[in-house]
Amino acid sequence: MANYPDFGGLLTRLLDYRQTDIAWLASASGIPDSELRSMADGVPPSASQVDGLAAALGFHTADLFVIAGFPVPEALQPCEAAAGSGLVNLIHVVMALPADQRTHIHETVEHLPQLPRIRPADPPRAFYRGDGGLGAMLVTMLCANRNLQSPINAAKTLHLLTRGRMYLAATTYGHIAAGTVPLRPTWVGGFATALGIPAADLAAITGTDLSEVTPPEDPLAAEMAELLWDCRRLRASQIEHVCAEAEAMLVPVPDDASCDDWNRVHHQNGTWWGAPRRG
């Protein structure tokens, strides 16, 4: 990937930020110190080393493959690419639900069976794979690893999870992936929120200064980022089932209801449907 720093350099940035070193990483990952030092000097990691590093560093293995500049192994890819189209609506609805109902949705997702992966004859165009360096890394983790696939889905999801702080035109994600626009601190913070990666970690990896734009702590956004990740193992039909179950929890919003007390989701036949804000 053109303009992409070697993995050893990115790993060193992260370790420096965390104020730890190769000796600690060797102990935590089970990878010999000598191999890690070679990696830091520019030797690419093996697939098994990526697995060990992911566990030690607290990253999803699929994400660390992308950070390392490698294709994600098929076994770590989402179950069905077509499932991505239903994820935005699911996140939109579940964010509005009170905590107990959100917990039910999480449990529903957790207990759905793992079905065989589907490989369509005409897979979606992988616009996010390119030679855009760190921008391609961010967009690939969001669109491919979280199964959002399209830039429109990515734009809507980031808008939801950042509570409107970040809304980019869909075409901008293509520019980010291609490396034709520089990464902005607000963008890196927004990606961190949607990816469920600590913003400071992502800033260290990308070499971004977040001192003036540190994203606020948002437990609900972190919870939705986790849901987005968990849904990657589901087929489109399963996501439709979960979304229907979530929508069935919505109730008519009273006409005189305050926005401070109710979350509104969609308007149908003169009535707003949503949920009371109970936490």
Predicted region positions:
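A short, Lys/Arg-rich alpha-helix, primarily the initiator
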Residues: 1-21, 107, 114-157
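Residue-level signal for the short linker/turn that defines the boundary of a DNA-recognition helix
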Residues: 5, 9, 19-20, 45-48, ...
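Residues in the helix-turn-helix
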Residues: 24, 35, 63, 172, ...
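Short alpha-helical "recognition helix" segments of helix-turn-helix
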Residues: 24-26, 53, 151-161, 191
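Recognition helix of helix-turn-helix/homeodomain-like DNA-binding domains
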Residues: 30-45, 54, 69-70, 159-183, ...
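DNA major-groove recognition helix of helix-turn-helix/homeodomain DNA-binding modules
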Residues: 49-63, 184-201
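Interfacial/linker helices and their anchor residues that mediate assembly or domain coupling
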Residues: 73-130, 210-279
